[in-house]
Swiss-Prot record:
Protein known as: Sulfite reductase [NADPH] flavoprotein alpha-component
Reaction equations catalysed: hydrogen sulfide + 3 NADP(+) + 3 H2O = sulfite + 3 NADPH + 4 H(+)
Gene designation per UniProt: cysJ
Keywords: Amino-acid biosynthesis, Cysteine biosynthesis, Electron transport, FAD, Flavoprotein, FMN, NADP, Oxidoreductase, Transport
Source organism of this protein record: Shigella flexneri
EC code(s) of this entry: 1.8.1.2
């Protein structure tokens, strides 16, 4: 059933209020809408609602604040599980996303728990950048009355493993905070470490925070996000791939695919800005090559999560083969006594470099050894899903979800190598074939609720994906706000992703401006950050008019270069020094007017 929106003249809300209401309720289920309706009825009639009970004074019961700083959702899931544990222990707890935390109140926190991941080259998650910057600034307060604990999630295949957690932990201590527990740094397989840490936190806090009354334990932040979808990272939807289209030219150095996935009647919902999680299977040819290099058959039985499987099946479905790590290299060297690899052990930088440049199968090829099947399995990490920025809006595509996939391809001594998930989608799933997917919601990359707000989108390469979703949504909403796109890639003729669609949006007036940077079409390389500087005066006018700025793409280089260009534009045309420009951009971030989806 479709609910018709009544004419605006009959509504007691102005257009801006209506837009905010629609944005806040667009992804709610009927059950959630019913609860919201009852909540507002209770407010109107001054009746108590289950989640609006007044907590006891802080003097009687010190509150526990959990700050969740998540990039891919894992840190948020750990924080939510801890909140539930503390509520079950009848403790007064509040869970807040780092992007929503009013960080100036940190001085009044008595019991503070931080759960954080790390992105890029050791940076905090996007939603925690402002808090991180505040704590490391001269404005950070003393925290002598604060006890804290930090749980850090990371990936040991990266050089700056768990750096964000290390930063928060050391800075909170430096500001005078008392450690409740030593920091825990967890790898990709974080679940066991998180479970143990949560139990220790609950035990530590029981002695610090008196037990809350039943009404208090319900009232103090038990609600953060309510997900009623039956599909999740651990229980994905089995959908079907309906379109796999190469959208770069035949002479392009890049292989970029437009992928469409049919969600059927699953009811799975997403918003522009969300990501699609994809569970993939390793290439059977890669599995066969690795097994044969180790003088195994692939039929050997191995144990995976309590189940006995043939080695080939375990490697294809359950273990990471396309990402090597320093730990794997070190363990393989020690296990096999490899003369080639043992000299690397103890040298973190060399181990990291070798792992970053050498696939597991090539490590085995270059340093051959014989391992039994269980030893191989124990060496590897569990397979994890890959996240892709969603390139569609359900306002246009309904029961579909689109993604833009840059396929990773390269050669090693004449042998073709490819990325695990990208080659799975591009090469190994037939049309109408099955794909296991889930939605990773990202409330830190959202279109403005006010449809009149101007939007500036900066997305070179596959970073264009969410802005296709943005434009579909803005067109469907008939949003009067202006839209400006900055896009870049090597060549105009080969790499202009979704060219016809952008031209149509310009013709229809949906896309107000488009600035393009082709880095290889002339002698001097030109990137999107150069276009930002070139259009600095107009860019500053848009910012002064309230524009929201969005950046999507590579975290390590592009995002940093774009941010530097924005700072230069703000300083030059806003008449500010470097420090003031940095403060101005930080304020835009806090106001959700500067949002990034970087990876």
């Amino acid at each position: 059933m479709t609910t018709q929106v009544p004419p605006s003249a009959l509504l007691p809300l102005n257009p801006e209020q209506l837009a905010r209401l629609q944005a806040a309720t667009t992804d709610l289920t009927p059950t959630q809408l019913a609860w919201v309706s009852g909540y507002f009825w209770g407010v109107l009639n001054q009746q108590p609602v289950a989640l609006a009970v007044t907590p006891a004074p802080a003097a009687e019961m010190p509150g526990i604040t959990i700050i969740s700083a998540s990039q891919t959702g894992n840190a948020r899931r750990v924080a939510e599980a801890l909140r539930d544990d503390l509520l079950a222990a009848k403790l007064n707890v509040k869970l807040v996303n780092a992007g929503d935390y009013k960080f100036k109140q940190i001085a009044s926190e008595k019991l503070l728990i931080v759960v954080t991941s790390t992105q890029g080259e050791g940076e905090p998650p996007e939603e925690a950048v402002a808090l991180h910057k505040f704590l490391f600034s001269k404005k950070a307060p003393k925290l002598e009355n604060t006890a804290f604990a930090v749980f850090s999630l990371g990936d040991s295949s990266y050089e700056f493993f768990c750096q964000s957690g290390k930063d928060f932990d050391s800075k909170l201590a430096e500001l005078g905070g008392e450690r409740l527990l030593d920091r825990v740094d967890s790898d990709v397989e974080y679940q066991a470490a998180a479970s143990e840490w949560r139990a220790r936190v609950v035990d530590a806090l029981k002695s610090r925070a008196p037990v809350a009354a039943p009404s208090q334990s319900v009232a103090t932040g038990a609600v953060n996000e309510i997900h009623t979808s039956p599909y999740s990272k651990d229980a994905p939807l089995v959908a079907s791939l309906s379109v796999n289209q190469k959208i770069t030219g035949r002479n392009s150095e890049k292989d970029v695919r437009h992928i469409e996935i049919d969600l059927g009647d699953s009811g799975l919902r997403y918003q522009p800005g969300d990501a699609l999680g994809v569970w993939y299977q390793n290439d059977p040819a890669l599995v066969k090559e690795l097994v044969e290099l180790l003088w195994l058959t692939g039929d050997e039985p191995v144990t995976v999560e309590g189940k006995t499987l043939p080695l080939n099946e375990a490697l294809q479905w359950h273990f990471e083969l396309t990402v090597n790590t320093a730990n794997i290299v070190e363990n393989y060297a020690t296990l096999t006594r490899s003369e080639t690899l043992l000299p690397l052990v103890g040298d973190k930088a060399k181990l990291q470099h070798y792992a970053a440049t050498t696939l597991i199968v090539d490590m085995v090829r270059f340093s051959p050894a014989q391992l039994d099947a269980e030893a191989l399995i124990n060496l590897l990490r569990p397979l994890t899903p890959r996240l892709y920025s969603i390139a569609s809006s359900q306002a246009e595509v309904e029961n579909e979800v689109h993604v833009t996939v840059g396929v990773v391809r390269y050669d090693v001594e004449g042998r073709a190598r490819a990325g695990g998930a990208s080659s799975f989608l591009a090469d190994r799933v037939e049309e109408e074939g099955e794909v296991r997917v889930f939605i990773e919601h990202n409330d830190n990359f959202r279109l403005p609720a006010n449809l009149e707000t101007p939007v500036i989108m900066i997305g070179p390469g596959t970073g264009i994906a969410p802005f296709r979703a943005f434009m579909q949504q803005r067109a469907a909403d008939e949003a009067p706000g202006k839209n400006w796109l900055f896009f870049g890639n090597p060549h105009f003729t080969e790499d202009f992703l979704y060219q016809v669609e952008w031209q149509r949006y310009v013709k229809e007036g949906v896309l107000t401006r488009i600035d393009l940077a082709w880095s290889r079409d002339q002698k001097e390389k030109v990137y999107v950050q150069d276009k930002l500087r070139e259009q600095g005066a107009e860019l500053w006018r848009w910012i002064n008019d309230g524009a929201h700025i969005y950046v999507c793409g590579d975290a390590n280089r592009m995002a940093k270069d774009v941010e530097q260009a924005l700072l230069e534009v703000i300083a030059e045309f806003g008449g500010m020094d470097t420090e003031a420009a940095d403060e101005f951009l930080s304020e835009l971030r806090v106001e959700r007017r500067y949002q990034r989806d970087v990876y």
